[in-house]
Amino acid sequence: MKLSSHCIDEKSIKLINKVFVIAQTSLGGFLNMAIDKFIFENFEKLTEENAIFVRFYTFANHTVTLGYFQNNIDQEIKNMYKKWAFVKRITGGKAVFHYPKKDLTLCVVGPVNIIKDNTKHENIPSQNIIKSIHKTFNELLWNSITQTIDIENINIENINFYEDKTQNKLTKFDCFKNVQAFEKEFNGKKVIGTAIKISQFSNDPYNHKFILQANIKLQNICAELNLPIKNKIIQNFLDHFDKIYHIEIKDLVNQFKKRLLLHATLGR
């Protein structure tokens, strides 16, 4: 599959206080996953120094993204969702159902060493790093949501909560049917689900990079979804993120733009 240069071009890339932000888009499920995979696998080609890439997006079609190790899908689920696109993520975890214009997805790609113990300003021990990444971004996203939406005064009777057709059939299949200790809920419904992959740098086996994909079920909080709410959540996230994780980057933005266009072919 080719990654069209018009999907990620110079106009869609913005450097905000040392973090590369790719403009919010609404694309099909296969293309959304291809872009995330491309950025992660080509991270070393896109920048010569530590950097962080942040991308918020929505899905233009009904899509089920499958965890990397989810290989066997129950035929009954396939039949009930036969009009949905099923596409693999590069990250692990369980399946996520993406509804057009209803939920919001975040992808973050960066070096593992940005995740630090902020009380000690030290790197997190390797055995705790995955849990720490999950917890860090769940907290950042939740703080961004609650800063945007007054959840204390929400009338839950007006909310059309995210539900699936197969109910208990999806308990072992659906990410949002399973809540981890670090994940956030509202009125008994999971709001944020995160999945992670960590790999060695191709040019430095002693250091590692990570990709985090987080899905936010805003429809489990808001009776009314609109672009201003989504944009405010995104801006709050970027503000929180920059205050906590200030990455030292020199003038790499032009290099990044040129390299992203130059290497815009999957599988290189």
Outline where the language-model segments fall.
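N-terminal catalytic or cofactor-binding beta/alpha core of small enzyme domains
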Residues: 44-47, 90, 121-127, 131
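Short acidic-glycine loop/turn motifs at beta-strand connectors
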Residues: 60, 186-188, 200
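A structural signal for short, well-ordered beta-strand segments
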Residues: 106-108, 183, 214-216
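Ordered, amphipathic secondary-structure segments that act as subunit-interaction surfaces
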Residues: 115-116, 126-137
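Long, positively charged amphipathic alpha-helical accessory segments at protein N-termini or as interdomain linkers
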Residues: 119, 134-170, 197-268
